Regions:
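Histidine/acidic-residue-rich, glycine-tolerant segments that coordinate divalent metal ions
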Residues: 57, 78-84, 90-91, 110-174
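Acidic/His- and Gly-rich active-site-bordering loop/insert found
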Residues: 3-112
Length: 174
């Protein structure tokens, strides 16, 4: 299923991953990574806003602009200071690009707008937080992303991904 589309981009995405891994940049300093990603997306005909949302290293690439259904693929590409890509954002960001390239190839059969959004500075300030506060995601039906882990899973019980409500009973102590 879609094997030819997958194979057609494999080498370029692997090169992208290796380039980002070999050139780790910490939050809001992902100039090489964001430029490499944007260059690859544009090479394959994806319209890209760069920089995006008043963030120098953020971008948004759009496939099938103007469709009523809207989906976002999020891409992270920042590194950890002193540790490089120990969190694997070189790989997860590249996989998001891989998905966008394949979906762009299949765009005629997709009745939805698909945006790939580069979300810088995930490790420190949280670039997605600024985007949420600015309403970037308000008009999307869904947003997805991938993150590296030591096993395959559709979902994981992370505090940052789950919603919890706490109710405290008693009298103030101070």
């Amino acid at each position: 299923m879609y094997e030819s589309e997958i194979e057609s981009f494999r080498a370029e995405v692997m090169q992208l991953n290796d380039y980002i891994a070999d050139n780790p940049e910490t939050g809001s300093e992902e100039f090489k990574a964001s430029k490499a990603i944007v260059t690859l997306l544009r090479k394959h005909g994806i319209d890209v806003e760069f920089p995006f949302n008043n963030m120098e290293t953020a971008f948004r690439g759009t496939i099938n602009r103007g469709k009523s259904k809207k989906f976002a693929i999020l891409a992270e590409y920042d590194a950890l200071r002193g540790l490089g890509h120990a969190c694997g954002h070189c790989a997860s960001g590249s996989i998001s690009v891989f998905a966008a390239l394949i979906l762009n190839e299949l765009r005629e059969s997709i009745d939805a707008q698909i945006d790939i959004i580069g979300t810088p500075d995930e490790e420190t300030k949280g670039g997605k937080v600024y985007m949420v506060n600015d309403g970037v995601f308000n008009d999307y039906d869904a947003a997805i992303m991938i993150h590296m882990f030591n096993m395959n899973a559709v979902s994981m019980p992370f505090l940052a991904l789950d919603s919890y409500e706490y109710i405290f009973y008693g009298a103030p102590a101070h």
